[in-house]
């Protein structure tokens, strides 16, 4: 996995921007269109948001553990498996986006208090091949970069579904 090497300030900016951008992209889109996939086998905007939320849960918990414990060992969890333990795929887009926005506000409040050394707190991640040492900054970068791709995907999905309706 390749994660862009972003400074903490850029991570914070991107993490704050994504919920706002999602709200802007979907503000005038009917609920039915947010549930529609652009073509068979592709995700609807709602499914992409559910995936974004699943990633935010999984990787956000890793960040929380690294801040609460000294060098914890964390078992890797796949957001694609974790999503099955949630109701995210069953939720309507707008309430799901509100919940995501609230969760993001809470994460940003925690991250805003970090001093530079705290961004470098570590965990050993096991269960997905070779054990890896990851930092709070790494998970922030991963989350920001991964979401950036999926926010763009939602924008493309909304445009594609709009054209077919």
What do these predicted ranges mean?
Residues 1-17:
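Extreme N-terminal tail/first-helix region
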Residues 3-6, 42-45, 82-96, 128-137:
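Acidic/His metal-coordination segments adjacent to aromatic residues that form catalytic metal sites
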Residues 11, 18-22, 55, 59, ...:
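Alpha-helical packing segments of well-folded alpha/beta enzyme cores
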Residues 12-14, 19, 86-93, 136, ...:
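Small-residue-biased structural context
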Residues 15-18, 83-120, 141:
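Acidic/histidine-rich alpha-helical segments that form the ligand environment
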Residues 20, 24, 28, 65, ...:
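A generic structural signal for well-ordered alpha-helical segments enriched in polar/charged residues
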Residues 28-29, 39:
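A glycine-rich, hydrophobic loop/mini-helix early in the fold
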Residues 35-79, 108, 119-165:
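Short, contiguous alpha-helical
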């Amino acid at each position: 996995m390749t994660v862009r090497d972003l400074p903490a300030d850029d991570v914070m900016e991107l993490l704050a921007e994504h919920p706002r951008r999602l709200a802007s992209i979907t503000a005038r889109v009917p609920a039915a269109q947010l549930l529609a996939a652009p073509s068979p086998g592709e995700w609807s905007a709602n499914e992409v948001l559910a995936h974004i939320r699943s990633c935010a849960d999984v990787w956000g918990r890793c960040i929380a553990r690294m801040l609460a414990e000294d060098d914890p060992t964390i078992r890797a969890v796949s957001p694609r498996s974790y999503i099955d333990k949630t109701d995210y795929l069953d939720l309507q887009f707008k309430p799901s986006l509100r919940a995501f926005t609230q969760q993001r506000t809470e994460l940003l409040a925690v991250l805003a208090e970090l001093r530079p050394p705290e961004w470098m707190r570590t965990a050993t991640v096991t269960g997905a091949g070779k054990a890896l040492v990851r930092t709070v900054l790494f998970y922030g970068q991963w989350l920001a970069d991964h979401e950036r791709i999926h926010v763009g995907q939602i924008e493309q999905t909304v445009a594609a579904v709009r054209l077919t309706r």
